[in-house]
């Protein structure tokens, strides 16, 4: 008989079906220690372990957002969910939808964690607390419309300060919807903006009943409020995170109303006392001023009032004279300045400057003409002198006096030693030349 081999996918799918259909694996309750936990923005993946085994855990974001504490590595927890097989890796895991600390109540654990977180952020710092309005006109009350809280606040406010207007903003103060209801009402009051004080609270109850006032969203809404908030949650021994974040904490609703309002009758008494004090102070001041006035009126200055202005009149005359002289000096200086400007303007007049430049040019032309004429005459005189000297040295001038010169073979004969008997020579005279032959040579002894 041949064996049938399954694919990995087929086997995994078969096991996944078994896990899904097994009624014991559809709802499993486990206790274990958190391991490999790292907070993610979407779904959470971590492990649960004990001394002998480890199982992978997945928790969808919708379920994780409902837990009341911050999971930490090493924390022992109680979880519930269903066992599943992840086919791609072949690993089984538990997909949980609830988780709470094991050994310590989940709400107390969540409370301590959130208090620590908000304290580090500074939401409890005193410098962030807003002062209450001493004489409020409108007070917003965020609480349940039924119950002793709203009745106590109304009774106390009307007894102490009936001129204040109370406006109820009904809110759910217990259960899963309470936190969102409280946050919505806080935002609504701030958006309307015409309130001086907010009172938020509820009566006593268990930690579960009071838990909406320990939610982080409620704490941040109170911290973000632009209007001062008085928190009054539970009994005097109960301290919620809303109490820690609020600007003022009241132990009871009655105490909240007392903190929010003064006693009108006491304020009226104070006003009357202030009025009497002001009247007395004014009377004293009037009396003092009257004494001063009487003293001034009886002074010798006021008895002879002309003394008050004699010196000022003299100073005024002096100032007028100085002013007149200063004005004359100013006019004189301005006239001189004007004359100087007119002179400069006349000197720099374009037509005058053009005329002056034309005259200068004409003078330069005349000087140049005279200079050139002088140079020409001088050169003419020197030329005549040179011509006369040259004429005196001219051979024609010499021959005119009876002299002649001899050429032999085209060369001038300067010495008798250059000639020989029978040499043919040419004699040049003033008016012509003659051919001759040397017949005899006589050389004179020196």
Curated annotation (Swiss-Prot):
GO molecular function: exodeoxyribonuclease VII activity; nucleic acid binding
Keyword set, alphabetical order: Cytoplasm, Exonuclease, Hydrolase, Nuclease
E.C. numbers: 3.1.11.6
Keyword Nuclease carried by entry: yes
Catalytic class of the enzyme: hydrolase
Domain of life: Bacteria
Main localization (coarse): cytoplasm
GO biological process, one term: DNA catabolic process
Location relative to the cell: Cytoplasm
Catalytic reaction list: Exonucleolytic cleavage in either 5'- to 3'- or 3'- to 5'-direction to yield nucleoside 5'-phosphates
GO terms under cellular component: cytoplasm; exodeoxyribonuclease VII complex
HAMAP family (alphabetical): Exonuc_7_L
Function: Bidirectionally degrades single-stranded DNA into large acid-insoluble oligonucleotides, which are then degraded further into small acid-soluble oligonucleotides.
Subunit structure of this chain's protein: Heterooligomer composed of large and small subunits.
Family from the record: Belongs to the XseA family.
PANTHER family for this protein: EXODEOXYRIBONUCLEASE 7 LARGE SUBUNIT
Name the record gives this protein: Exodeoxyribonuclease 7 large subunit
The species this protein was found in: Ligilactobacillus salivarius (strain UCC118) (Lactobacillus salivarius)
Upper taxonomic lineage: Bacteria, Bacillati, Bacillota, Bacilli, Lactobacillales
């Amino acid at each position: 008989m041949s064996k049938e081999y399954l694919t990995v996918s087929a086997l995994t799918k078969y096991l996944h079906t078994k896990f899904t259909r097994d009624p014991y694996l559809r709802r499993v309750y486990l206790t274990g220690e958190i391991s490999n936990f790292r907070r993610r923005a979407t779904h959470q993946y971590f492990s649960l372990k004990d001394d002998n085994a480890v199982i992978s855990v997945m928790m969808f974001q919708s379920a994780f957002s409902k837990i009341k504490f911050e999971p930490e590595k090493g924390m022992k927890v109680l979880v519930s969910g269903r066992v599943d097989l992840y086919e791609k890796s072949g690993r089984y895991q538990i997909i949980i939808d609830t988780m709470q600390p094991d050994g310590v109540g989940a709400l107390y654990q969540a409370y301590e964690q959130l208090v620590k977180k908000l304290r580090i952020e500074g939401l409890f710092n005193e410098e962030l607390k807003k002062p209450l309005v001493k004489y409020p006109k409108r007070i917003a009350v965020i609480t349940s419309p039924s119950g002793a809280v709203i009745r106590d606040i109304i009774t106390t406010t009307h007894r102490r300060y009936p001129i204040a207007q109370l406006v109820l903003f009904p809110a759910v103060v217990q259960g899963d919807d309470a936190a969102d209801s409280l946050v919505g009402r806080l935002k609504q009051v701030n958006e309307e903006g015409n309130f001086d004080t907010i009172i938020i609270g509820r009566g006593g109850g268990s930690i579960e009943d009071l838990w909406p006032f320990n939610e982080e969203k409620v704490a941040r809404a109170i911290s973000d409020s632009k209007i001062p908030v008085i928190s009054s949650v539970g009994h005097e021994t109960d301290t919620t995170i809303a109490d820690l974040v609020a600007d003022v904490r009241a132990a009871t609703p009655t105490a909240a109303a007392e903190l929010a309002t003064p006693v009108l009758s006491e304020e009226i008494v104070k006003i009357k006392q202030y009025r009497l004090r002001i009247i007395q102070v004014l009377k004293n001041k009037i009396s003092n001023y009257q004494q001063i006035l009487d003293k001034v009126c009886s002074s010798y200055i006021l008895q002879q009032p002309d003394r008050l202005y004699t010196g000022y009149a003299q100073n005024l005359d002096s100032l007028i004279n100085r002013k007149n002289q200063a004005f004359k000096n100013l006019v004189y200086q301005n006239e001189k300045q004007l004359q100087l400007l007119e002179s400069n303007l006349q000197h720099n007049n374009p037509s005058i400057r053009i005329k002056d430049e034309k005259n200068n040019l004409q003078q330069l032309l005349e000087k140049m003409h005279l200079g050139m004429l002088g140079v020409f005459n001088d050169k003419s005189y020197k030329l005549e002198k040179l011509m006369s000297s040259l004429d005196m040295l001219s051979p024609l001038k010499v021959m005119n006096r009876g002299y002649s010169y001899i050429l032999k073979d085209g060369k001038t004969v300067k010495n008798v030693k250059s000639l020989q008997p029978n040499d043919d020579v040419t004699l040049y005279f003033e008016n012509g030349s003659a051919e001759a032959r040397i017949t005899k040579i006589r050389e004179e002894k020196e």
